[in-house]
Amino acid sequence: MKFLDQAKIYIRSGNGGAGAVSFRREKFLEFGGPDGGDGGRGGDVWVEAVDGLNTLIDYRYQQHFKAKTGMHGMGRNMTGGKGDDVVLRVPVGTQIFEEDNETLICDITEVGQRYRLAKGGNGGFGNLHFTTSTNRAPRRANPGQEGIERTIWLRLKLIADAGLVGLPNAGKSTFLASVTAAKPKIADYPFTTLHPNLGVARIDGREFVIADIPGLIEGASEGVGLGDRFLGHVERTRVLLHLVSAQEEDVAKAYQVIRGELEAYEHGLADKPEIVALSQVDTLDPETRKAKVKALKKACGCEPLLLSAVSHEGLNDTLRQLARIIDLSRAEEAGTAQAEE
């Protein structure tokens, strides 16, 4: 399935049904009074988060959505039926924005969460409503109210517990494939990964979701390369795993480039807990390994983990560290929610 994380769509709620002009028609009742019913309300437009989706690709092929018009009122004071609603089914993590693509309407973060984007028009009054002391047989009824028309943006920010960041070819996709059942495209050239991939990692009876973000380069926050578009997918993560390839001549600079982009992007990414790891260490001799670990430690201010997806060196240790931070974050979140209650 192709990945799409942004879509512009046009929605319109249904018009209300027209009220009816009707009079009682009964045997032995020569002048029956008015009995025109009201029109039904127009259908609403809703957005709802469903399980099993991680792309907005369906909205590439259909951009216009219109709810049904309410049924017209009928005689015998019968109100018309409500028009059918339209429900936009989206992945968990979808945000809805106004036409300017900046004003947030709602943030859909849980399966089953619904939000009404456009309310259907009210039905028109039937002629029964227009009876007065001087007009006992009104021949007038209201048309239904017009529906609401809006242009909106859907923007998906994947919900993952851990995010993988690093320069192109840092080994992010290889790591994801090694510790989860995900099957990202892997090749020996930059920008092999063109969209985020998700995988579920398991360690010591615990499981969490990891997001692999396409490689960043210097200037990504200004739109260079793939730009910073995909950084939005790690905004919701609890921890970042920053991979620095052992193939880099200057591992300190490689680390600093990504840190600079995280800080330039803002939105709290630079403040997230970070685990730094030197990847592809199976390609180094002991002396070179020692030198690169020392340089990276100096740059990041902590002892980097050593990783190799080929020899599986350090994989379990890395997962345990990620799980520990994620557990702490979840516990803190649960404590905050409990305190608010």
UniProtKB/Swiss-Prot annotation:
UniProt domain Obg: residue ranges: 1-159
The entry's protein name is GTPase Obg
The cofactors it requires, by name, are: Mg(2+)
**Pfam assignment, any one:** MMR_HSR1
Q: Cellular component terms, GO, for this chain's entry?
A: cytoplasm
User: Main EC class of this protein?
Assistant: hydrolase
Question: What is its quaternary makeup?
Answer: Monomer.
Entry superkingdom? Bacteria
Gene field:
obg
Source organism (scientific name): Brucella canis (strain ATCC 23365 / NCTC 10854 / RM-666)
